[in-house]
């Protein structure tokens, strides 16, 4: 039996059980494994996106970089983190990544020194103070060096296209205001965004979306949903922004004819089973 005939036979047999089979690198397979940051990055890769430089602003202990590196192993990685507590972990990580470097500083709209509120849990540390009362959430202020992303690009000689990730607890727009020149050569931006005004003078989801729209970027994907302990309301999420007229938005239709046919078939089978149970 020819291979093509065998494949058709296997697919036909699976469809009888309302099952489908896909290549691991197909668009459909990617869509079925989208949980977490790596899922977002794999989907971006499947679209043909290949960043020359990955900017990880607010690297913490290196979680994002460690997930991103296997997806884009040929990219240059530049990690920026102001907390010295993370330095040992970041040093170990960058030593294992052949094209990575870490700079211990905060990113802001201006160069100089800034006051960083070092939280007891470290991960929530921010240039902004939280509005929460009757807790020690804001921790202890610490003076740290601040640089702009544009100056970082110039100093390191980094080249685009860029993938920019920013997780800085409320200071995202400050970081972006210091990255105006770099944004011109950036295709994909991943921001952690809050749905509430957790930080004094900090932006919420709507503020960030409007700012990004004014810079020519729109929402493309989401991940990392977090819920606040207070009432279990959705509180923060990771939002991927892409150029409104760029690589990721060249097509605005929903599916190919083959994909639409396969989806219709699955829906019809599901409805037939549902109707059969109600007879």
Question: What is each of the regions a protein language model found here?
Answer:
Residues 1-279:
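Phosphate/nucleotide-binding beta-alpha loop and adjacent structural elements of enzyme active sites
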């Amino acid at each position: 039996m020819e291979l093509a005939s065998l494949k058709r036979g296997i697919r036909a047999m699976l469809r009888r059980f309302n099952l489908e089979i896909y290549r691991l690198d197909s668009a459909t397979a990617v869509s079925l494994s989208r949980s977490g940051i790596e899922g977002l990055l794999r989907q971006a890769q499947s679209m043909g996106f290949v960043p020359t430089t990955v900017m990880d602003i607010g690297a913490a202990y290196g979680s994002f970089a460690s997930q991103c590196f296997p997806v884009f192993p040929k990219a240059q990685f530049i990690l920026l983190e102001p907390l010295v507590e993370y330095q040992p972990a970041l040093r170990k990580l960058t030593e294992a990544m052949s094209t990575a470097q870490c700079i211990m500083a905060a990113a802001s709209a201006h160069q100089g020194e800034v006051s960083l509120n070092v939280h007891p849990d470290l991960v929530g540390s921010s240039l902004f103070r939280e509005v929460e009362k009757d807790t020690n959430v804001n921790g202890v202020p610490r003076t740290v060096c601040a640089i702009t992303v544009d100056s970082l690009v110039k100093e390191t000689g980094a080249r685009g296209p860029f993938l920019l990730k920013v997780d800085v607890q409320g200071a995202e727009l400050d970081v972006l205001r210091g990255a105006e020149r770099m944004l011109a050569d950036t295709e994909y931006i991943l921001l952690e965004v809050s749905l509430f005004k957790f930080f004094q003078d900090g932006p919420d989801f709507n503020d960030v979306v409007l700012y990004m729209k004014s810079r020519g970027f729109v929402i493309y994907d989401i991940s990392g949903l977090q819920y606040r302990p207070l009432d279990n309301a959705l509180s923060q999420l990771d939002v991927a922004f892409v150029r409104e007229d760029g690589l990721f938005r060249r097509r605005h239709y929903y599916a190919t004819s083959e994909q639409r046919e396969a989806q219709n078939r699955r829906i019809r089978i599901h409805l037939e089973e549902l109707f059969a149970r109600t007879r």
